[in-house]
């Protein structure tokens, strides 16, 4: 197996970015978290624009347009730091990620000169408008139309978008429409254009602090100069953005899970029951260890893919790997937040405790960027037994990533890897039986695996976590 990127072998400049992001988070975001959740007017935008002063909103934008032009690893570091509040994370991501990347990759020189400096300094807020009421993961089913005017100077857009992050804040939307009802095309649409109307704020289960609205387009005249890329080639832009979005669920899952684990460790060490702290209970140690193991696996998986993308310089060649990260990471963080609430007991169900917010926020990530069900189909390309085949591929890739990383680290990483291996083998075996049952064949007979004392491994991992009070490898 080839060498791969891990968080332990990041460069000095990456560690510097991590420190800067952490300092910004502590000084500028944490004091405003409650106000962000309440959507107090101006607070979220104010924090976002302060992040622009440090270059975070222009992290991927070329320097000549006022950005930092940092590599993908740097972007992931910032995403992981900001993941401690998903509302702020998705707001920042819509600005610095899917709001800017299509323009960076596919924009004309004139478009870049006009818009990128304003996106970099956050004087202009960006949003990405693809989803429609009848077209979610099936993006090619959109109905928004774009018709060229007789003089050839404008496209007239008509349609409705929904679930638009930053929808109520944005000044510039990347809108997808079908030219003549057929040619899937991207447009740069300014909010100031007549006929552009954001809808009311949606009332969501989670992400309470972020702006999510519909977008209505009523005879909107968009200059032909604002076609992004080529007419009929908008799917390339959309799918590249989806791949990046799927990959970014990796750092979200790790950042959120680390915070929930730290909160759970602190609570378990303080909460007493039957004369002792609940951290001494085997059932609680089991949960804490499993939370850490999932963090290690997701961390190993997504950093490996980041390294592969940086070496390949093209994300389109790693679309399946991005889908694997999306599925594995979103399901891992779902487990972690659920166990975090369980460790907190009744307090975990109360809004005064942060784990309640993490629990609500995490649920969307199995739906974002294409549902996990559709991503499994994309991984396997086999409709009949696609889910089982995808699960085998995901578990194998995650296990291999963890093993590659553990080879570079000490015995504690080996312990976590042993648990990952044990669980992956069980899931692969179950998926294999499902495939053979569906096809009416007998699964191969394999010799029994060597027994693994998973209870002892979990106790050992949990004790190390409790001693440190946080996630450690």
Regions found by a protein language model. Give the residues of each.
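Alpha-helical interface subdomain recognition
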Residues: 1-84, 89, 106-111, 118-123, ...
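Short glycine/proline-enriched turns and hinge-like loops at secondary-structure junctions
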Residues: 70, 138-140, 166-170, 208-210, ...
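Short Gly/Pro-enriched turn/cap motifs at secondary-structure boundaries
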Residues: 92-93, 134-137, 163-166, 178, ...
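A short, Trp-centered hydrophobic/proline-enriched beta-strand micro-motif
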Residues: 122-130
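Flexible, small-/acidic-enriched active-site or ligand-binding loops
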Residues: 141, 194-223
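A structural signal for short hydrophobic beta-strand segments in well-ordered beta-sheet cores
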Residues: 144-148
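A short core secondary-structure module
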Residues: 153-198
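Long, acidic (Asp/Glu-rich), low-complexity accessory segments flanking structured domains
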Residues: 219-237
């Amino acid at each position: 197996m080839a060498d791969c990127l891990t968080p332990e072998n990041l460069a000095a400049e990456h560690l510097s970015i991590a420190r800067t992001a952490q300092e910004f988070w502590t000084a500028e975001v944490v004091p405003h978290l409650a106000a962000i959740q309440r959507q107090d007017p101006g607070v979220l935008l104010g924090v976002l624009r302060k992040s622009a002063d440090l270059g975070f909103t222009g992290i991927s934008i070329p320097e000549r347009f006022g950005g930092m032009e940092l590599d993908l690893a740097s972007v992931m570091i910032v995403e992981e730091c900001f993941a401690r509040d998903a509302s702020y994370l998705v707001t920042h991501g819509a600005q610095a990620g899917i709001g800017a990347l299509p323009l960076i990759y596919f924009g004309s020189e004139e478009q870049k000169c006009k818009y990128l400096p304003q996106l970099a300094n956050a004087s202009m807020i960006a949003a990405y408008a693809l989803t429609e009421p009848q077209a979610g993961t099936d993006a090619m089913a959109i109905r928004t139309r774009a018709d060229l005017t007789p003089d050839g100077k404008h496209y007239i857009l008509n349609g409705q978008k929904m679930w638009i992050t930053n929808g109520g804040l944005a000044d510039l939307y990347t809108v997808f429409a079908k030219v003549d009802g057929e040619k899937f095309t991207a447009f740069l649409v300014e909010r100031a254009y007549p006929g552009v109307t954001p809808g009311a704020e949606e009332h969501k289960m989670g992400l309470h602090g972020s702006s999510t609205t519909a977008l209505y387009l009523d005879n909107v005249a968009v200059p032909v100069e604002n076609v992004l890329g080529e007419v009929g080639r908008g799917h390339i832009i959309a799918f590249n953005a989806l791949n990046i979005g799927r990959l970014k669920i990796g750092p979200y899952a790790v950042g959120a899970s680390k915070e929930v684990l730290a909160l759970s460790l602190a609570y378990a060490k303080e909460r007493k029951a039957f004369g002792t702290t609940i951290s001494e209970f085997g059932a609680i140690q089991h949960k804490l260890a499993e939370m850490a193991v999932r963090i290690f696996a997701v961390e190993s998986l997504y950093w490996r893919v980041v390294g592969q993308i940086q070496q390949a310089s093209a994300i389109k060649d790693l679309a399946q790997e991005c889908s694997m990260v999306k599925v594995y990471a979103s399901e891992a963080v779902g487990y972690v937040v659920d166990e975090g609430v369980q460790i907190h007991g009744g307090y975990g169900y109360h809004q005064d405790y942060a784990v309640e917010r993490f629990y609500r926020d995490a649920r969307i990530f199995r739906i974002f960027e294409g549902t996990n069900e559709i991503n499994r189909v994309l991984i396997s390309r086999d409709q009949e037994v696609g889910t089982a085949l995808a699960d085998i591929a995901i578990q194998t890739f995650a296990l291999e990533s963890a093993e590659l990383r553990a080879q570079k680290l000490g015995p504690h990483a080996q312990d976590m890897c042993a648990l990952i291996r044990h669980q992956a083998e069980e899931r692969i075996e179950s998926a294999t039986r499902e495939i053979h049952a569906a096809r009416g064949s007998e699964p191969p007979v394999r010799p029994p695996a060597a027994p693994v004392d998973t209870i002892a491994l979990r106790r050992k991992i949990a004790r190390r976590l409790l001693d440190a009070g946080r996630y450690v490898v």
